From Swiss-Prot:
Region of interest called Disordered, as start-end residue ranges on this chain: 230-270, 294-326, 473-597, 612-704
Organism listed in the record: Pyricularia oryzae (strain 70-15 / ATCC MYA-4617 / FGSC 8958)
Compartment(s) where it occurs, according to its Swiss-Prot or TrEMBL record: Endosome membrane
Name of this protein: Vacuolar protein sorting-associated protein 27
Zinc finger extent (FYVE-type): 168-228
Biased composition (Low complexity): 549-578, 640-651
């Protein structure tokens, strides 16, 4: 191919381009010849692009328009390799500079419009191709800059798809016989496929018009067979044996293409003659087919007579032959029309049967109920039209309604629709009520379902918290302290508290397990693990909900060995009730200063942490409340608290006697002198003395834990 890329070819291309653009009239034949030269890679595509760019920059507007038309033709027929050069910055930027030129260098308005139109059409057909994307970028840039483009013309992307000679591939052996290339066995390339072959496998030469190559070039045996088979197949199928004898070569009907001159020679005016010759041959072929078709429809006697007559009168005149051909052509056309009508009738009958079958099937499968009381679309439209006209009459002068016969007709027709409309309205309201009822039922079911889910969640949460305590359920007794929990009280309790007025818990009734918030679980576990029996847990005077209890490791007191199971049960129940107070500080409860009954329990002060084992005297004193027998508490050993806690403690005040409500048989005197109990290094301090055990059975069976839901349905 390098032998083609010579300076002579470039000079010839420049001459052809100059000749094609020298006139204001477009020479289509010469333009196609130049595009074939570019597509066949006879000249480098970059040189062809530069020649066109040079011609577009001419000062004559007619020359510029002709050069632009030639460039468009080459873009549509020059191949992919030429499109890459057209889409380069060198060519596109030159067009943009012509558009933006001002002053004496400004281009003509027609040239300017043609450049914009070409850029717009090229950007449309090259959309989606990466190697040609610069045209689209320039088109968008010009749009943003405010250039007025002509109306878009729909151009298919196949307009720029054209076949070009393939790129040559290299190989060390022949791609057909696998013979290695040597000094004597030279390498040759096939112009049709671009592969390497030796002299033995690529000795044939044929023109390749589909690649723009009109003179014979070297091809291998495989490509030669493919091209010749295609040409023979097209010729034999179209014209028959007689046509093959008249046109032995593929290009025999195109004499202007079988030339021995250079490729740059322009086409002559015989192009039209060749086209007419091809058209005449095609008409002759169609007439032969019509004759054979008409002979099949003709009677046998007529066929024999015609054959005899053709044998006898074989050398008849040309005019008589033309007349006979016209008659045969008319007969063939009539036969084809009759056949077409017959086929159309058959097709319509089949289509009619199919539609009837589908309609019957649809009618059998689903029959929509027909309601006589429903309004038809026409009736609804009449009602809307009547309402619209009545609204318009509100602004019209009086008497207009008398001059509008359409309103009277609509009024008469709508008056008959009142029963139907009323029935339709009634049916609609009943449907609306039914839907509302269904919606209410659904809402009720959803509410019950949500409540059931909440119950299950509360049970699961309560089981998890109880498992964390790891303790038995104590028997609940009546508490002498004001309740620090919420105002709600358990159901079915006999009496009320003296201080708060709320129902008291039964002594023998198993306690209901309350639900504690997560933040109080740690304090409750430490309290039940280390607190001694019958120790009352009361908040100190400086109580704050954010303070955390002191570590339980500082408290070394252990309960005495003689405490029974019921004593531990009683103390645990009491401690369990009082621990719920810190978890709900925001509840509306009496404060330690406002409630006189609770001031004794909340104003209890802490004493020094360095306490020694103390004992309570057994001398009773008079008390206004029913008394219980008290026994001296067991001795407890306490470890000294930190110095910071000792400084915060205050001297204890004289405590009052707590009120205890038990059975009437247990009324004894309380001790006279009250000594403060050892203070526990916790946020809650002891405020009352230890009470004696009730005379209950020592071995009473403990009731099982009954878990109840927090939310009662």
């Amino acid at each position: 191919m390098m032998s083609w890329w010579s300076s002579g070819a470039n000079t010839a291309l420049d001459e052809q381009i100059e000749k094609a653009t020298s006139s204001s009239l477009e020479d289509i034949a010469l333009n196609l010849e130049i595009s074939d030269v570019i597509r066949s890679k006879t000249v480098p595509p970059k040189d062809a692009m530069r020649s066109l760019k040079k011609r577009i920059g001419h000062k004559n507007p007619n020359t510029q328009l002709s050069a632009l038309e030639l460039t468009d033709t080459c873009v549509k027929n020059g191949g992919q390799h030429f499109l890459v050069e057209i889409a380069s910055r060198e060519f596109i930027d030159n067009l943009v500079s012509l558009l933006k030129a001002t002053g004496p260098a400004a281009v003509n308005a027609d040239v300017r419009a043609r450049i914009l139109g070409l850029i717009q059409s090229w950007a449309a057909v090259t959309q989606g191709r990466v190697e040609l994307s610069y045209i689209g970028e320039v088109y968008k840039t010009l749009q943003h800059e405010g250039f007025q483009f002509p109306p878009k013309v729909a151009v298919a992307t196949s307009m720029i798809d054209s076949s070009a000679p393939p790129e040559w591939t290299d190989s060390d052996v022949c791609m057909r016989c696998r013979t290695p290339f040597t000094f004597t066995n030279r390498k040759h390339h096939c112009r049709n496929c671009g592969s390497c072959f030796d002299q033995q496998c690529s000795s044939k030469s044929i023109p390749l018009p589909h690649l723009g190559i009109m003179q014979p070039v070297r091809v291998d045996d495989g490509c030669y067979a493919k091209v010749t088979d295609k040409s023979r197949g097209s010729g034999g199928a179209g014209a028959g044996a007689g046509y093959d004898r008249k046109s032995p070569s593929l290009y025999s009907s195109f004499p202007h293409k079988n030339r021995s001159s250079s490729a740059m020679q322009p086409r002559s005016a015989r192009v039209d003659d060749g086209f007419d010759e091809d058209l005449k041959k095609a008409l002759a072929m169609s007439l032969e087919e019509v004759k054979s078709h008409s002979r099949n429809y003709a009677p046998a006697s007529n066929g024999v007579a015609n054959s005899g007559q053709s044998k006898v009168n074989g050398d008849s005149s040309a005019t008589k032959t033309v007349e006979e051909e016209d008659d045969d052509l008319k007969a063939a056309i009539a036969a084809s029309l009759a056949d077409m009508e017959e086929q159309k009738k058959k097709h319509s009958a089949v289509l009619h049967e199919q539609t009837h079958s589908t309609e019957a099937a649809s009618a059998s499968t689903f029959v929509p109920p027909k309601n006589d009381y429903e309004l038809t679309p026409v009736e609804a439209e009449n009602i809307n039209l009547f309402a619209t006209l009545v609204d318009r009459l509100q602004t019209q002068p009086p008497g207009t309604i008398l001059r509008e016969p359409q309103i009277q007709e609509l009024y008469d027709s709508i008056g008959t629709l009142r029963p139907k409309l009323a029935r339709t309205y009634g049916e609609t309201m009943s449907k609306h009520d039914t839907l509302l009822d269904l919606h209410a039922k659904l809402a009720t079911v959803v509410r019950y379902y949500d409540r059931m889910l909440e119950e299950r969640l509360s049970k699961a949460y309560g089981q998890r918290n109880f498992a964390g305590y790891n303790m038995h359920v104590p028997r609940q007794t009546s508490s002498p302290y004001p309740s620090l929990q919420g105002p709600s009280a358990p159901a079915n309790v006999p009496g009320e508290s003296f201080y708060t007025g709320q129902p008291q818990h039964d002594y023998a009734e198993p306690s209901r397990q309350p639900s504690y918030p997560p933040q109080a679980s740690g304090a409750q576990q430490q309290f039940h693990q280390y607190a001694p029996p019958h120790q009352a847990s009361q908040p100190s005077e400086g109580w704050q909900p954010s303070h955390t209890p002191a570590p339980a490791a500082q408290y070394a007191g252990q309960p005495p060995q003689q405490s029974t199971e019921s004593t531990h049960s009683h103390s645990s129940a009491h401690n369990h009730q009082n621990l719920a107070a810190p978890s709900a500080p925001d509840q509306s409860l009496p404060t330690p200063t406002t409630d006189p009954a609770a001031s004794y329990y909340f104003n209890q002060q802490q004493v020094s942490a360095l306490q020694t084992p103390v004992s309570v005297p057994a001398e009773p004193v008079q008390s206004p409340y029913p008394n219980l027998q008290q026994q001296p508490p067991a001795q407890y050993q306490h470890s000294p608290a930190p110095q910071g806690q000792a400084q915060q403690q205050k001297p204890p005040q004289q405590p009052q006697q707590p009120y205890w409500q038990h059975s009437a048989s247990q009324n004894t005197a309380l001790p006279t002198n009250h000594q403060p109990w050892p203070q526990v290094p916790n946020r809650q301090s002891a405020s009352y003395v230890q009470e004696p055990l009730p005379s209950a059975p020592q071995h009473a069976p403990q009731k099982p834990v009954v878990e109840e839901a927090l939310i009662e349905l």
